[in-house]
Amino acid sequence: MNTKRSEEIFGAAKNLMPGGVSSPVRAFKSVEGDPIVFDRVKGPYAWDVDGNRYIDYVGSWGPAICGHAHPEVIAALQETLEKGTSFGAPCVLENQLAEMVIDAVPSVEMVRFVNSGTEACMAVLRLMRAFTGRDKVIKFEGCYHGHADMFLVKAGSGVATLGLPDSPGVPRSTTANTLTAPYNDLEAVKELFAENPDAISGVILEPVVGNAGFITPEPGFLEGLREVTQENGALLVFDEVMTGFRISYGGAQERFGVTPDLTTMGKVIGGGLPVGAYGGRKEIMSMVSPSGPMYQAGTLSGNPLAMTAGIKTLELLKQEGTYEKLEALTKKLLDGILTAAKESNIPIYGQSISAMFGFYLCEGPVRNFEEAKSSDTELFSKIHRLMLQKGVYLAPSAFEAGFTSLAHSEDDINATIKAFQEIFSEIS
């Protein structure tokens, strides 16, 4: 496979941007290679600057649930573009997307739009503290809530990719109020509440962990968190930046039947444009400025282009049979991967929910980040390189979830499974 042009562009980029990229995982450092440089995307496919085509299971890290450059999304964007790219003022599109989010997500009675998932999580932490009058927060090992200082504690994902326990430049004082527990360990959470009476503002988590690979909640875990937070006068926050509108129309909270107090969102609700949001009970959200004293603002928040792409994407997702199709397609893909590995005697453990999936190169089960780290990352790096040569683009990290889309066909899934079969057979 010829990647000469990608190599040239990335070589130049390293003199222009730190590591040659705008986000660390894109550098392919954890898979011991140089990144491919994309030229265009369409449907389930991505083409690099050398003309190679890939079946894409990264989907711009989650937003492309309808497939890249969906014609209806593009048409809607072109219409809005004629009216301007940014108003810096209220527009009716904000109302429309807000109504759709409120109708869909059980916990959300009011919503505030921002520009990224990181920004949403930063704001929601401030809101948790403002509403409760408490400073401490509990997060889980391997759960990633963006690159804000107070969340870069045992954060999985990009931090794990770099092999760092946390990040230099984050003062201890900044994270002193961030408490951590193993994911799926309810007793550890109860112990933290017992050790810090009337001091914990709330618990924030990815209800399905997509930034430590793909880890699902054990039966009773989410329900237990809901109970223990209520008992202690603390808030429960679901970070649904990744799972929102992806594992069901109403997100993980609809899927599992557990309603948090607050929710952060991003990715899908922007249809491929920069976006984030946080929302929850009206009683809590009324504290956000200008209604209340908790300040948060943004120059491009509620950008008309992002609102337009989000509205059209949610309209497409609301069509009958959408999530049944995604569930079946993703299950077929994962089952094929697991079967192919087992036929070649390669240890593997994996799971899928709707349009998300992940696998670990170990026996499993994987219930938390510590168990996830037993996955064979060197073997994953080799598989990643070989899959690229077969025309399949997987996330360039052993600790990232994979994504399917409505644009993926049975033929795409079959071709991907065949590529895995050939590679597993070759390396076994």
From Swiss-Prot:
The protein's superkingdom reads: Bacteria
* Reactions performed catalytically: (S)-4-amino-5-oxopentanoate = 5-aminolevulinate
* Coiled-coil ranges (or none): none
Q: Quote the NCBIfam families the UniProt record gives.
A: hemL, PRK00062.1
Known EC number: 5.4.3.8
Q: Show the GO cellular component annotation of the record.
A: cytoplasm
Protein encoded by which gene: hemL
Q: Which GO terms describe its biological process?
A: chlorophyll biosynthetic process; protoporphyrinogen IX biosynthetic process
HAMAP family from the xrefs?
A: HemL_aminotrans_3 (MF_00375)
Q: Does the keyword NADP apply?
A: no
- Hey, which family's this protein in? Belongs to the class-III pyridoxal-phosphate-dependent aminotransferase family. HemL subfamily.
Q: Where in the cell is it found?
A: Cytoplasm
Which named protein is this? Glutamate-1-semialdehyde 2,1-aminomutase
Q: Which SUPFAM superfamilies match?
A: PLP-dependent transferases (SSF53383)
Native source species = Prochlorococcus marinus (strain NATL1A)
Biochemical pathway: Porphyrin-containing compound metabolism; protoporphyrin-IX biosynthesis; 5-aminolevulinate from L-glutamyl-tRNA(Glu): step 2/2; Porphyrin-containing compound metabolism; chlorophyll biosynthesis
Q: What one GO molecular function would you report for this record? A: pyridoxal phosphate binding
Positions of post-translational N6-(pyridoxal phosphate)lysine modification: 267
The UniProt keyword set, sorted, is: Chlorophyll biosynthesis, Cytoplasm, Isomerase, Porphyrin biosynthesis, Pyridoxal phosphate
Q: Which cofactor does it need?
A: pyridoxal 5'-phosphate
InterPro entries membership: 4pyrrol_synth_GluAld_NH2Trfase, Aminotrans_3, Aminotrans_3_PPA_site, PyrdxlP-dep_Trfase, PyrdxlP-dep_Trfase_major, PyrdxlP-dep_Trfase_small
